[in-house]
Amino acid sequence: MAASGGTKKAQSGGRRLREPSSRPSRRARQRPRRGALRKAGRFL
């Protein structure tokens, strides 16, 4: 996990999706860690 803007953005999004684990359950599953890693890789 590289400390970069991409990871920060991914973490904020993950936290938002993790908080309301009632409606965006499928979205949270689709963007658990793969989305964060993909965003970080793209930003790096």
From Swiss-Prot:
Interacts with KLHL15; preventing ubiquitination and degradation of RBBP8/CtIP. Interacts with PARP1. This is Poly-ADP-ribosylation-amplifying and CtIP-maintaining micropeptide. GO terms for biological process: negative regulation of protein ubiquitination; positive regulation of DNA repair; regulation of protein ADP-ribosylation. It comes from Homo sapiens (Human). The lineage of its organism: Eukaryota, Metazoa, Chordata, Craniata, Vertebrata. Residues 24-44 have a biased composition (Basic residues). GO terms for molecular function: poly-ADP-D-ribose binding. Keywords: Chromosome, Nucleus. Its main location: nucleus. GO terms for cellular component: nucleolus; site of DNA damage.
